Amino acid sequence: MGMGYLAGWLWFLAVVAMANGGGTPTSSINGLFTNHGVAAPFSTHRGIVATQDGQKRNIVLVWLYDHRGCYALLLIDAETGKSEEFPTPFPYGGDAPYASILSSNNRLYSHFGSHFVEFDPTKRAFTFIRKTVPQMAMSMTEDDNGVIWSATYPQCGIAAYNPKTGEFRDFGHVHKENWAQYPRSIAVDDAGWVYFAIGYTRSHILALNPKTGEVKPMIDESERRQGMAYVFRATNGKVYGQPVAGEKGNWLELYKGTARKVGELPPNAKPKTFIAGSQALFHRTFPDGKRIRTLDLAERVLVVEDPKTGESKTVRFDYKSEGGHIMSVAVAPDGSVCGGTAFPFYAFRYDPKADRWERYPCYGQWNTVAKQGDRFFVGGYTGGFLLEWNPFAAWTGTTKDNPNANPRYLTESEPDINRPHELLAHPDGKTLVLAGTPAYGFTGGGLLFWDRQTQTKTLLRHTDILQWHSTMSLVALPDGKLLGGTTTAAGTGGERKAKQAELYLLDIASKKVVWHEPILTGVQEYTDLCYDERNGLVYGFADRRRFFVFDPKTKRIVHQQETEPCAYQQGPRVFVVAPDKRVFVLFVRSIAEVDPKTFALRPLAKTPVPITAGGDYLDGRIYFASGSHLWSFRIPSP
């Protein structure tokens, strides 16, 4: 997703958090809306560090993240389990750490929500906060003078803080590209020059002279390729880097703002150790040598082991959470309402008749869900994977190489699809079609066809469909064709190349596009599509705010109007079709019904909370998500 999508989504999460409140049990509002509660009532971490407080007690610092964003830093006493939450001391707007560092002076630093922040565990307090240019650090390091450096997404912002003097320098955005940049590594040589490596559309390594603010490239334009560059600080005082991380050889020695090609990495180029990392940072070792064996935020359990004695100690801790945001909602063949959350990655099953929840750690992020026959299918991020779940059998969890797992791993489609936006369960009962945007730094997404009878896949690339486009929405037509709606958005960190989105018709048998056209001028995304059996027309939303009606026979728009924004998620599910063929629309703040003759959007109700993900029908109700909560709406009689 591009920067505009991310910024809007982070703001929206903050609004949803305020509307939903905490982990509310099932409750009804005015007889129409029911809040069924939180799908996954726990948080995930965005960095964990084992360290000590001012009394030399072992403590654990955990950045807590739920559907609101990174809302607090949790401090756990490793001996007693006693915990304390320190609310994030600035308006984070749904953002979260993507990098943190514990300095040599035992201070925890991060940079997110356009704020650089320091936490001092000896004082048990946030001790420095400074607003910066947007937005969040993708890498952080410490130089030989104890200065903390950060490099931020999406426009290569560089910031530095000297804890000894209190001086903070925001160098601003120091490198421009027309795509969102991920500076995933940063290093400083012993001469004080700062080097940072970016990706994904075109890798690069740049150097900053902190004395003058000068920024200069370390590799030629001809050496820049799709992927992520890499730099690290060595114990010999120099920095080493690669134009593309992981390549054999091709190393550069970087020193005093110059680059020298050295081929293989020199034997004396040993990485200098820092307690730093991405959002997955998990530093397990305490200063006294004890180690974290387990930290489980779902079970609220901490296990610490002593390698010297082999003994371990288990303590329970607690914290507040509003739960992970729901990515997808659909009705399963067993009559339950199911979907997935992120973050953390959990699958949920809700039985409305018994008012009972089941929750399972799941494989990846469930962007798109759909049922076909007696199975429930999942299209997920990362890798554009496809899962098959039998809800009538015991849940075992997913292992890629286990054909008996439930859910069962079927296949994946990276790099052509990395982040799914549509999973079409075709009415033929055997075909599944997955669509979405491609891998990081790529432009143009494919289509994955899965044949359940033969258990085989066909993967089309964007060049087989529409070059530089990705498919955002799909609907099956009765003549053996698919109508697809594209997005011009590239894969995360990629470059947008198509000028406007298009509709296309694809013949399923031949897998060939037989027609395409940018039918609505200037549109960047066809958010969702729905076929109405009553009139043979297709309803759609373009850029979330333009409702249109398309005639697949004449290939023309027969109606269009501007509306309030429709509900939105990576797999939107804006339209909900009832068994009697009535078609409903989920807007962010209301629910409407489409008149099949006049195409009027008849308002049914204003929603008490924002709708963040659709949407399915069960027993006279429409189920949808608002942040971390599952809601439903009782449909009035026609």
Regions found by a protein language model. Name each.
Residues 35-43, 87-92, 129-133, 172-178, ...:
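Surface loop/turn motifs at the tips and blade-to-blade linkers of beta-strand repeat domains
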Residues 41-51, 93-101, 134-142, 179-186, ...:
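Repeated scaffold domains used in trafficking and secretory/extracellular systems
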Residues 59-63, 107-110, 147-150, 194-197, ...:
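Conserved beta-propeller blade signature
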Residues 65, 434-444, 484-500:
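Short, conserved, GDST-rich strand-edge loop motifs in beta-rich repeat architectures
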Residues 65-66, 114, 154, 200-201, ...:
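Residue-level signature of beta-propeller blades and closely related beta-rich strand-turn architectures
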Residues 72-74, 115-117, 157-159, 204-206, ...:
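A short loop-to-beta-strand structural motif that recurs across blades of beta-propeller domains
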Residues 78-81, 120-124, 162-166, 209-213, ...:
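Short loop/turn segments that connect beta-strands within beta-propeller blades
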Residues 609-638:
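Blade-level signature of beta-propeller repeat domains, shared across WD40, Kelch, NHL, RCC1
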